[in-house]
A protein has these predicted regions:
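Membrane-integrated ABC transporters
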Residues: 1-53, 68-86, 100-109, 122, ...
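Juxtamembrane helix-loop junctions of ABC transporter transmembrane domains
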Residues: 2, 13-21, 52-61, 65, ...
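Transmembrane helix-loop-helix hairpins at lipid-water interfaces of multipass membrane proteins
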Residues: 39-96, 177-184, 280, 293-297
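Hydrophobic alpha-helical transmembrane segments of ABC transporter permease domains
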Residues: 40, 44, 52, 56, ...
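Hydrophobic alpha-helical segments in the permease module
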Residues: 86-97, 191-199, 264-278, 284, ...
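Loop segments that connect adjacent transmembrane helices in multi-pass transporters
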Residues: 135-138, 211-259, 331-336, 349-351
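Cytosolic ends of transmembrane helices, especially the final helix of ABC transmembrane type-1 domains
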Residues: 215, 238, 262, 309-339
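ABC-type nucleotide-binding domain
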Residues: 353-617
């Protein structure tokens, strides 16, 4: 039975997620898609259970009246049928509670937030690189986890508090009116007083909750940032500095917690005073009516029981409302991140890219970063012929990496077009575009998975033999075979650590090269692809790279000019403009920037001049 309910709500829907709206209620409504029927069912059962509980007091009052007017011998015979009916109602309530519990806990409690995490995660995977340039990875993760749980808890609390308590309050007011309309007065006054207290405290708790959620995300982000860059922290002996950096975030989080607890304490004191007044007022009025013959003993017992129950309910409501608006604050904070519009999206008419020849054309391309008014490119024109191998050269900030990022459509151009085989990349799908381009970067990050998983990232359907062949061609198989970990795993089954931290820089770069060899895309981009390799390994890999580049369109970037001197054509960029182009010998004879850079080489690396610009964005 449990498993039947657990399978009612699909946890991992296959349809593409849609960015939810930014409004609070519209965001929550969008989150309930696929689960609304089940949420309605727990709302109905919650209302029915609340009405049932109110009816129990009426039954209890009648039983007390029967006890006061009948002898023990008469009681069973006179009221047996009614008591049997009461017993049947009590037994039937167990079925109602079972349904409510199964839907709440088996259908929704785990499946619903997991479904939201899945959808939010897919939305964040589709976000543009510019989004992650301004966000902590840990902060984004925290908001995905927190917001999913907060939406679930806010819905559950709304059902329990708003619907359940409203049904209960209506039930006991109607019951009190059936006894004597005057018995409604203390209950109604308590409801008004409690409503006023909620109106004062709850919005303030919600505002604090929003600040607290943001402070928690900032604290988590700073701590995660330190762990993710632990090598840099250790290298510069900044453990104390990082601790202080995290402490400031922790202090800010603690301040929001202190503000929250002050409000909670005041709310609890006010709530206790209201509960005391309710108990005294309701009990006193019931006893007064009994003393004047206007109410029976059963009515007095029922009213006192209702007042006691409402008093205990009020404490529960207070904590639920406090947590509800803390969750509201968490959701509002999550909305700011999870509903951001992607800066790079597929066009409505986007089609898969078809690469037949590999010609690349930059046609009057203009581009500037969002946070910089200065244009990186202003009318760049460059044609790369099918199968041509070009090398990009330039000082830092010349635009080399930006040109590659635009080709990969990590950013959209501000003007002009980039075409591959005549197809505007703005009108092809991003997945098909990047599937057609293999790239090795100098900053090689590996996934915290096995060596096999990282290699097969290049082509998941590759065979074991193809994977091992690619490793051998990249001069990686020898060190992979020697790998061992503390779990007894070896070779391709060893986990490489977060970002590949268990491997040296050269080993990571060889894995990245093997991965691109396995991908075997028609366009190849090499951004300092061999910068972390020693000369002996580089010479060995260069032969494999030459074989890999055969028949492909290649763009190579390297500060070590000897690495790209043999390319078909060298393009020299300076301040976003093409200032020289030609073969190695032609550019040396021209005596321009390339010749000067070649002359400044020291140990095979590019010596930056004093006029070199800031690091490329």
């Amino acid at each position: 039975m449990y498993s039947w309910f657990e399978r009612r709500l699909p946890t991992f829907p296959l349809e593409d997620p849609v960015t939810p709206p930014r409004g609070f209620f519209s965001f929550v409504w969008a989150c309930t898609k696929g689960a609304r029927g089940w949420i309605l069912l727990i709302a109905l059962t919650s209302a029915a259970l609340a009405a049932y509980e109110a009816a129990l007091f009426a039954m209890m009052g009648r039983v007390v009246d029967w006890l006061s007017s009948a002898t023990p011998a008469e009681f069973g015979g006179r009221h047996f049928g009614t008591l049997a009916g009461f017993a049947a109602i009590l037994a039937g309530s167990a079925l109602l509670i079972a349904l409510h519990t199964m839907v709440k806990h088996q259908v929704l409690a785990i499946n619903f937030p997991m479904r939201l995490r899945w959808l939010f995660h897919r939305l964040m995977l589709d976000q543009s690189l510019s989004f992650y340039a301004n966000e902590f990875a840990g902060r984004v993760t925290t908001k995905i986890m927190q917001t999913a749980l907060a939406v679930r808890d806010a819905l559950f609390m709304s059902v329990d508090v708003v619907i359940g308590v409203a049904a209960y309050l209506i039930g006991i007011l109607a019951l009190a009116a059936s006894f004597d309309w005057r018995l409604m007065i203390p209950l109604a006054l308590w409801a008004l007083g409690y409503g006023a207290a909620c109106a004062f405290f709850v919005p303030r708790l919600g505002a604090v909750g929003s600040r607290q959620a943001d402070a928690r995300a900032l604290m988590t982000g700073r701590i995660t940032d330190a762990y993710s860059n632990i090598t840099t922290v250790k290298l510069f002996s900044h453990t104390r500095r990082e601790a202080d950096h995290a402490r400031r975030a922790m202090e800010a989080f603690k301040a929001t917690g202190d503000a929250q607890m002050r409000l909670v304490s005041a709310f609890e004191i006010v709530n206790h005073l209201l509960s005391t007044l309710l108990l005294v007022g309701a009990s006193g009025l019931a006893l007064y009516l009994w003393m004047h013959g206007r109410a029976s003993a059963g009515v007095v017992a029922a009213v006192i029981a209702m007042a006691l129950r409402l008093s205990s309910y009020s404490h529960w409501i207070m904590w639920e409302m406090t947590e509800l608006f803390e969750n509201v604050g968490t959701i509002q904070d999550g909305i700011n991140t999870l509903t951001k519009v992607r800066s790079v999206v597929d066009a409505p008419d986007a089609r898969p890219l078809a690469v037949n020849r590999g010609e690349i054309v930059f046609d009057n391309v203009r581009f500037a970063h969002e946070d910089n008014d200065r244009a990186v490119f202003d009318g760049l024109n460059l044609t790369i012929r099918p199968g041509e191998r070009i090398g990009l050269i330039g000082r830092s900030g010349a635009g080399k990496s930006t040109l590659v990022n635009l080709l990969l459509r990590f950013y959209d151009v501000g003007g002009g077009t980039i075409r591959i085989d005549g197809q505007d990349i703005a009108h092809v799908t991003q997945d098909s575009l990047r599937s057609a381009i293999g790239m090795v970067t100098q900053d090689t990050s590996l996934l915290h998975r096995t060596m096999r998983d990282n290699l097969l990232y290049g082509r998941p359907d590759a065979t074991e033999r193809e994977m091992q062949d690619a490793s051998a061609r990249a001069e990686a198989s020898e060190f992979i075979d020697r790998l061992r970990d503390r779990h007894g795993r070896s070779g391709y089954d060893v986990e490489v650590g977060e970002r590949g931290v268990k491997l040296s820089g050269g080993q990571r770069q060889r894995v990245a090269i093997a991965r691109v060899m396995l991908k075997d895309a028609p366009i190849l981009v090499l951004d300092e692809a061999t910068s972390a390799l020693d000369s002996e390994v580089e010479v060995a890999i260069q032969r494999s790279l030459d074989s890999l580049m055969s028949g492909k369109t290649v763009i190579a970037i390297a500060h070590r000019l000897s690495t790209i001197a043999a390319m078909d054509r060298l393009i020299v960029l300076d301040e976003g403009r093409i200032v020289e182009e030609g073969t190695h010998q032609q550019l040396l004879q021209a005596g321009g920037i390339y010749a000067a850079l070649w002359a400044h080489q020291s140990g095979g690396f590019l010596g930056e001049t004093a006029e070199a610009e800031g690091a490329e964005q």
